[in-house]
């Protein structure tokens, strides 16, 4: 099983948590981004650079992910594709996307996108907090424990 990271927008603190976990467990960890991101010199950690372009990293992850893999992403449509392939999707805030919650998340995303395109300022997400980091690490450890 592989941990895939939608790394273009992944917070540094989350990447560091992932690096520590990959070192500890030996699980394959692949960061996918359209820019080069430094990774530790560890055999099971790699960086896959994709061409510049809208959703290029998302498309590459969706193409490569298989059942049982874990994908770290904030991108709701990518999370839906991952779930449809029987893999797991986890946000950097520690929210596990599931078949039970992904449709509601997609609907909310689409609604907010419609609001923004009509000129309504919806604001963005709050800064990542220590409790978000802990929630992420806890969910990651749960997945790793099942290996």
UniProtKB/Swiss-Prot annotation:
Q: Which residue positions does the secretion signal occupy?
A: none
Pfam families according to UniProt: DUF188
Question: In terms of domain of life, where is this protein from?
Answer: Bacteria
Name the HAMAP family for this protein: UPF0178
Q: Which family does it belong to?
A: Belongs to the UPF0178 family.
Protein name in UniProt: UPF0178 protein TERTU_3490
Lineage of this protein's species? Bacteria, Pseudomonadati, Pseudomonadota, Gammaproteobacteria, Cellvibrionales
């Amino acid at each position: 099983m592989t941990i895939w990271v939608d790394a273009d927008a992944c917070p540094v603190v989350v990447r560091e948590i992932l690096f520590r976990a990959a070192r500890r467990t030996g699980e394959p960890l692949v960061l996918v981004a359209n820019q080069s991101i430094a990774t530790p010199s560890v055999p099971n950690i790699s960086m896959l650079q994709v061409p510049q372009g809208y959703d290029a990293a998302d498309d590459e992850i969706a193409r490569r992910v298989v059942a049982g893999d874990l994908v770290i992403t904030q991108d709701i449509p990518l999370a839906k594709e991952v779930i449809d392939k029987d893999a797991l999707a986890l946000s950097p805030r520690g929210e596990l996307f599931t078949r039970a919650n992904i449709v509601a998340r997609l609907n909310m995303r689409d609604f907010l996108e419609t609001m923004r395109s009509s000129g309504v300022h919806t604001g963005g997400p709050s800064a990542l907090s220590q409790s978000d980091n802990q929630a992420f690490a806890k969910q990651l450890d749960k997945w790793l424990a099942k290996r």
